[in-house]
Every structure is written in C-alpha cells, then in structure tokens.
Amino acid sequence: MVKHVLVAGAGASGLMAAIAAARSGAKVTILEAMDRPGRKLLVTGNGRCNLTNLDPELSSAYHGADPVFAKSVIEQFPPEKTLDFFHGLGLLTTDRSGYVYPYTNQASSVLEVLLTEVRRLKIKVKLSEKIERIFREEGQWKVQTATWTYPCDSLILCCGSKCMPQTGSDGSGYALAASAGLSVHTPSPALTPLLCEGKFLSSLAGVRCHARVTLLRGREVPVASECGELQWTKYGISGIAVFQLSRHVSCASKSERFAAEIDLLDPYSDDEVLSMLRTRALALQQEKVSAVLRGILPEKLIPVIQEKAGIPVKMTCAALDEKSIDALLHTCRAFRLTITGTKDFDTCQLCAGGVDLSALSPETMECRSVPGLYFAGELLDVDGPCGGYNLQWAWSSGYVAGRHAAI
C-alpha cells in the first residue's frame, strides 16, 4: 500500500522531507501557510544561501539539550550527501574555505532546483493553508486548516521556529507539537545582534571592522570568544562574531549580566602595535593623536577610543607620553561594552530551544509515543553556528524524516 505523507511547511527541511518521502514511494502533499514556498530560504546567507559547511567536526557543532541527537542525524545524511543530492538536481556549487554556496551565488537557484524536483515527483503543494489543528482519527492523522481537513498516514512537522515571522515562521508549530503531547524548550533568539549601553553608539552606526569579541559573564568570567567582522549599530554590536556568541546571552537567566570585550587589534601583538604607535608619534609631533590612529582604526572609532583612553581629541603627538600610548593600546585591545540583551525574534536568524528531542528517535525522526508523527528542521531543539550548519541540519533531518515517514 502506498503511504500518504503530509509535510507541514515548505521551507528547507520541508522540501527535503517531501522529496525524500516521494523518492521512497510515498504520495506526498505539502501544506504551506505562506503564499509561496521557501521564503526564508531565499534570504539565507544574505540571499546567497550557504548550503552547507565542510567542517570535519560539523556534526559536533550543534547546541541544544541533546547535541548527540543532532550528531546522529547529521551522520546519516552528512554534507557529502547534501552535495551529491544538489548536484543530482543540476545545481553547481562552489567551496569557499569549507563554506559551500550555489555557483550562481543566488539562493533562488537552490529553491528553484528543489521546486523543479517537487514538480517532477508530482508532489502536491497547497499554499496559503495554515494548519489550525492536528489529531488522530480512525488510524490516520487529520490535519485541519481553515478550508479543509487533510487525512494522511504520516505527518511531518517542518513548521519552522519563531524567528523571522515575516517569512512564515511564526512559532505555531510549537503549539501543534504540544497538542500531540510533546514538550517544548522555551525558544530564545540565536544568531542575533547584541544590545549594549553607550551614548556613543549612535555615532558608530554602520562602522565595520575586524575584531575579536569575548563574551564575559559578570564582566570578568570568559564564556566564549569569536573573531570576524564586527558591525557597530545604534543599539549595540552585530556581525558574525557577535551572532555566534548571542545564544549564551539569550538563553541565560534574566538575572545574569554580560559584557563584551572587543580586541580591535587582533591578530597583532602588543609589541607590534606599540612599535608602530611610538614610531608614528615621533614622526608626527605636530599632528593630532588621531593622525597616528588613522591607519589602525576606522575614522569614526578614533574619537571614541581617545575618550575612553583619556586622551583629549586636540592633543598633539608631542604630548603623547608612554602612559598615554599604553592607554591607547589597552583601550583598543580591551574595549568594554555592557550588554543589556539581544534583538528579538523579528531580527534573529535562528532560535535556540524548540521541541524536546527526548521524545523522538534520532534514527527516524519519529515521535516514539505517537506513531506516524515526524519532525524536522528549526522546530526542534537544535541550533548551530553561522556558516551553513543550520541548513545542513534542515537537509539532514528532513531527509531522515521523509525517508522513514514513507516506509
């Protein structure tokens, strides 16, 4: 007997689940709440879609209550199989130091090859169909929308998380999972900018620079450190290095306090920077101190650094003594910001938290206590770093769920 599989959600994991189920012989229907499929996929990687990552330790890079679960799922459908899958759909890819993108550099190419395969496999796609209720009746799953009740043998929930609700991820999948008896770890924004104190921040909005950002608990205890592009905003700091650290803040208790220590000189040593500062100050005696810093820092950062270091904006290099040079070095090396929180679900790229994995089988993605109910993607309590890790989770979990839902 041919199984009828219904997939809730036409995002990355949902499209993969539907294709895997159809290739395994099932009749497949996708229900999508939005007016077109793959809206979030189109904006991933700033519209370029970082498909996966060839990091050899990728399967161990995920967060959540049970990282071993994610590792087990990823190993069933690793990045190598993801590349084979997309190459088989006619998508050329390019590898940039392990970060894999479509050769066209366009997320739309990824979505189009997926939708072409959906059409080839005669998978039905019902758009603008928001699921209101799921329930078991007469040995089948019933999926109720405002317009229809769809019966199916297996149901795969790929409804997404709460992040970027404008793309369709409004968090409604958590309620559907809860209605089936599953627990949900409270979602928090992840891969998101940090909110910080500082009146000077408005003057730095839009400034980008290379930096190492260290997250401190209580201003003293290092939690984690990341290096990369830092973007200053009117409300705090952003950029990939900040995104990687943000989950530690959003997942912490409200009573915990954090600070960011920013090294604006990474990877240069103290001796290298001191030598340059001394040499340039000696050569530019009649110039303002800012002249020495222009080859080191973005222009808008210079007055902020000088103020933090206690050096008047109008001071000339002739007045720059060893103590002042040390103050400049220290301020650039350990610029402190008090963190007040993170941006919200509208802004974050991912959620930490989600459906509790302990109720699922990592071999099949099926709920152990509720037969025929499967899960994949962001809805689950799995989140990874920037760089293709989270799309790989979508491909892997979607593939495993789809294949087993069809059996």
Regions found by a protein language model. Name each.
Residues K3-I30, A401-A406:
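N-terminal Rossmann-like FAD-binding beta1-loop-alpha1 element of flavoenzymes
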Residues L6-A8, L31, I131, Y150-Q166, ...:
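Short hydrophobic core segments
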Residues A22-N46:
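Glycine-rich FAD pyrophosphate-binding loop
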Residues D35-P37, L42-V43, L51-L58, L92, ...:
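An anion/pyrophosphate-binding glycine-rich loop and adjacent beta-alpha core
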Residues N46-S97:
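Glycine-rich active-site loop/strand segments that organize a redox cofactor
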Residues Q76-S154:
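Feature captures the FAD/FMN-dependent oxidoreductase FAD-binding
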Residues L127, P303-D383:
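A glycine-rich dinucleotide-binding beta-alpha-beta segment and adjacent secondary-structure elements
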Residues S154-F200:
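Glycine-rich loop(s) and the adjacent beta-strand/alpha-helix scaffold that form part
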